[in-house]
């Protein structure tokens, strides 16, 4: 079921809880923060079919960011923190991400060569744009031009480098019912 619908029907119900119980988010929080993040992505000039990358460890904010991309008509590429710097660099370049969401602590531990056109948004501290600060002034309501997005995953690459798998996105607004 759509998180926005859960937000209306059971706003205070927990949507996600981390395995240690320290991170929790309700459906209302997920919906509102993903809406704010969607507006933020739009403010950066991202348009339908553009891409973002998410390089995070197990963090519930991944879900909020992924949902924001999903409701903004964007591709989102999850990148494992277990990858070597060369693999991360390759995926960032290949998926044509315009924004990278990560933590400064992850950047400090890796030796990434970030593409110059990439906007880095950190979820903790650091010189990059801070996610919490960046989204705080944006509305918690959905975007008027919401569209469906999708995850762009990478195969294991049996012939060498991993291959990005990008599905076509619908041209209609998000939530549009198709005639069959």
List PLM regions with ranges.
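A short N-terminal helical cap/helix-turn-helix that marks the beginning
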Residues: 1-16, 32, 150
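Conserved pre-ATP/AMP-binding loop-to-beta segment of ANL
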Residues: 11-12, 58, 136-156, 160-161, ...
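Conserved AMP-binding/adenylate-forming core of the ANL superfamily
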Residues: 15-59, 67, 84-89
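Conserved structural elements of the adenylate-forming
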Residues: 31-36, 165-180
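Solvent-exposed alpha-helix faces
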Residues: 35-39, 93, 105, 160
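Structural core segment of the AMP-binding/adenylate-forming
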Residues: 43-44, 67, 71-136, 142-145
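Conserved S/T- and glycine-rich ATP-binding loop of Class I adenylate-forming
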Residues: 52, 69, 100, 155-158
